[in-house]
């Protein structure tokens, strides 16, 4: 339960997000069956969120906080750190495990 992080390509291994910093990422979100539900890459616009401000689901924040600058990783988020029993109507089914491909581009 929680978030599992699988490194696709390593980052610098030194620069990690700190609470209050803004993470700039590219991501693709998928259901376990591989169906894509969202992607910043499709919009050609990186996504920004602040660590510790609950601006994203818990699993996404917990996973990104453990990534170093430049790292690409696969985050597997169980429902308890995603959208839970409610899901996100029309997009995320109830009790869905979500998979995100994330690249930490910058910290502000």
From Swiss-Prot:
Relay the activity regulation note.
Inhibited by both FK506 and rapamycin.
Which SUPFAM superfamilies does its entry note?
A: FKBP-like (SSF54534)
Gene Ontology cellular component terms for the protein in this record: intracellular membrane-bounded organelle; sarcoplasmic reticulum membrane; terminal cisterna
Q: Which GO terms describe its biological process?
A: regulation of cardiac muscle contraction by regulation of the release of sequestered calcium ion; regulation of release of sequestered calcium ion into cytosol by sarcoplasmic reticulum; regulation of ryanodine-sensitive calcium-release channel activity
Which keywords appear in this protein's UniProt record, sorted alphabetically?
Cytoplasm, Isomerase, Rotamase, Sarcoplasmic reticulum
Compartments (UniProt record): Cytoplasm; Sarcoplasmic reticulum
Q: What is this protein called?
A: Peptidyl-prolyl cis-trans isomerase FKBP1B
Q: Where is the PPIase FKBP-type domain?
A: 20-108
Q: Which PANTHER family match?
A: PEPTIDYL-PROLYL CIS-TRANS ISOMERASE, PEPTIDYL-PROLYL CIS-TRANS ISOMERASE FKBP1B
> Self-association or partners: how does it assemble?
Identified in a complex composed of RYR2, FKBP1B, PKA catalytic subunit, PRKAR2A, AKAP6, and the protein phosphatases PP2A and PP1. Interacts directly with RYR2.
What is the top-level taxon of the source organism?
Answer: Eukaryota
The free-text function statement in the UniProt record for this protein reads: Has the potential to contribute to the immunosuppressive and toxic effects of FK506 and rapamycin. PPIases accelerate the folding of proteins. It catalyzes the cis-trans isomerization of proline imidic peptide bonds in oligopeptides.
Q: Pfam family example for this protein?
A: FKBP_C
Q: From what organism does this protein derive? A: Oryctolagus cuniculus
| PROSITE patterns associated with the record | FKBP_PPIASE
